[in-house]
UniProtKB/Swiss-Prot annotation:
PANTHER family given in the database record: 3-DEOXY-MANNO-OCTULOSONATE CYTIDYLYLTRANSFERASE, 3-DEOXY-MANNO-OCTULOSONATE CYTIDYLYLTRANSFERASE, MITOCHONDRIAL
Organism from which the protein derives: Chlorobaculum parvum (strain DSM 263 / NCIMB 8327)
Cellular compartment(s): Cytoplasm
The keyword Ribonucleoprotein belongs to this UniProt entry's keyword annotation: no
CDD domains according to UniProt: CMP-KDO-Synthetase (cd02517)
Purpose of the protein: Activates KDO (a required 8-carbon sugar) for incorporation into bacterial lipopolysaccharide in Gram-negative bacteria.
Name this polypeptide is given: 3-deoxy-manno-octulosonate cytidylyltransferase
GO molecular function, one term: 3-deoxy-manno-octulosonate cytidylyltransferase activity
Record bears the keyword Cell inner membrane: no
Main location class: cytoplasm
Lineage, broadest ranks: Bacteria, Pseudomonadati, Chlorobiota, Chlorobiia, Chlorobiales
Length: 248
């Protein structure tokens, strides 16, 4: 089975200007993310999909495989799908380009279910357990929460605190969604061909398009948190953590 990690990398970003090219201990942020992805044991190939000649050149010089995609794409999954048409494969992993501290084993958690006996999943993603008393996280609309069924499939994703806590119960589980996905190739192609759904537009969460159209998203629990980079403060924190983990 051919598993391809695709890292979407736009030059423009809303909150931190040109963050993909921000320096992280001597190399651009996107290069550091690509380096971590290359350590995956279950992926056969790592490709960066970009709309920027500058990012393309930086990654090419670093030895990465890079493909150019349209600058008119509206979301990262569209960029993944366009890259998938160019490179081919059976399973495609969508790894965010601003996660240079991603543990390769965490990536492999999302890939592993595709190697299990039985039908392959439509899509997999990761969730991080939260404690019921972490209300500042659960109530934060910038943190996406997930509710799962008994088999680990997503019932719903929301920016609201779900499940709603009418009573405090010891077995109530809260999960924060981690935006790493692995798609079966045919599901990825079908996903981008579907119009944005009502719930997707309401919550501004594209994964709801899959659920509304009857696809299942298998959620795998991880206890490894991965910080992204959206602000200058987060970039400084990632630099500090990078030095701790890898040295300066």
């Amino acid at each position: 089975m051919n598993v391809v990690i695709v890292i979407p990398a736009r030059l423009s970003s809303n909150r931190l200007k040109e963050k993909m090219l921000a320096d992280l201990e001597g190399a651009p942020l996107i290069v550091r993310t690509w380096q971590q992805a290359m350590k995956s044991r279950l992926a056969n190939r790592v490709v960066v999909a970009t709309d920027s000649e500058r990012i393309f050149a930086v990654l090419r010089d670093a030895g990465a495989e890079v493909v150019m995609t349209s600058p008119d794409l509206t979301c990262g999954t569209d960029r993944i799908a366009e890259a998938a048409e160019q490179v081919g494969g059976d399973v495609f992993v969508n790894l965010q380009g601003d996660e240079p501290l991603i543990d390769p084993a965490t990536i492999d958690l999302a890939i592993a279910p595709f190697f299990e006996d039985g039908p392959m999943p439509d899509c997999t993603t990761l969730v991080f357990p939260l404690k019921p008393d972490e209300r500042h996280i659960i109530d934060d609309p910038h943190v996406v929460k997930a509710v799962l069924d008994a088999k680990g499939n997503a019932l719903y994703f929301s920016r609201c605190p779900i499940p709603y806590r009418r009573e405090t119960l010891p077995d109530t589980r809260y999960y924060r969604h981690i935006g790493l996905y692995a798609f079966r190739a045919d599901v990825l192609k079908a996903f981008v061909a579907l119009p944005p759904s009502m719930l997707e537009r309401t919550e501004s969460l594209e994964q709801l398009r899959l659920l509304e159209n009857g696809y299942r998203i298998r959620c795998i629990e991880t206890t490894t948190d991965t910080p992204g980079v959206n602000t200058e403060e987060e970039l400084e924190e990632v630099r500090r953590l990078f030095r701790e983990r890898f040295g300066s």
